[in-house]
């Protein structure tokens, strides 16, 4: 990982500290004008703190081949492609936790960044046209899968700390996307899904399904 093992052990993601300080500064200045404006500034601080929160998560122990949700949010795609591979997409609104997690035990085989647009991440075409970062993995059994961090209408920065050659456990935090986004999973043919369209999931806790 591009960061140390203690990087994500704080209740607030460290990437959010500069934003929290700026919001706190704005709130302080607003209090100089009026209490009402100052309270609005405190709401801004609360929003930023909430966005970058890092709540503790208990990663499920089984079953073998389980796929853990890589993000908090709502399932907007859960389907089998004509090729037989299975696609799951999770949309994160600005109130969800935005840290992204590794879905399976495996080794990172590739990381690729794609520049692009910033349309609403809930649209299907966002997966192909928006700024995104693809992480490819291979399990111990040789199954390949990819997860793609997709920037959204508000999101303007994708952070990914996973590196090729690393072996990571399911539930490991590997990055985040700032202020509204989406994560796409491309899973092997024969994957059994345990979630449905519209379902709300929690990163690192909800089991999306099992690998073949």
What are these regions (language model features)?
Residues 1-212:
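Contiguous, well-folded functional domains in the mature portion of proteins
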């Amino acid at each position: 990982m591009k960061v140390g093992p203690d990087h994500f052990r704080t209740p607030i993601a460290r990437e959010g500290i500069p934003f929290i300080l700026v919001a706190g500064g704005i709130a302080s200045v607003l209090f100089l004008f009026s209490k009402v404006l100052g309270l609005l500034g405190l709401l801004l601080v609360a929003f930023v703190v909430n966005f970058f929160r890092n709540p503790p998560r208990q990663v499920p122990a089984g079953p073998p081949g389980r796929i853990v949700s890589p993000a908090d949010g709502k399932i907007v795609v859960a389907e089998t492609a004509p090729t037989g591979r299975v696609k799951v997409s999770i949309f994160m609104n600005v109130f969800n936790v935005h840290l992204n997690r590794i879905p399976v035990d495996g080794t990172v085989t590739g990381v690729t960044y794609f520049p692009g647009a910033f349309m609403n991440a809930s649209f299907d075409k966002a997966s192909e046209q928006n700024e995104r970062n693809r992480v490819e993995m291979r399990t111990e059994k040789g199954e390949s899968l990819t997860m793609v961090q997709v920037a959204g209408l508000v999101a303007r920065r994708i952070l990914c700390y996973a590196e090729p050659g690393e072996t990571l456990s399911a539930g490991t935090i590997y990055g985040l996307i700032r202020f509204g986004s989406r994560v796409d999973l491309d899973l092997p043919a024969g994957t059994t899904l345990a979630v449905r369209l519209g379902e709300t999931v929690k990163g690192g806790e909800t089991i999306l399904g099992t690998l073949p």
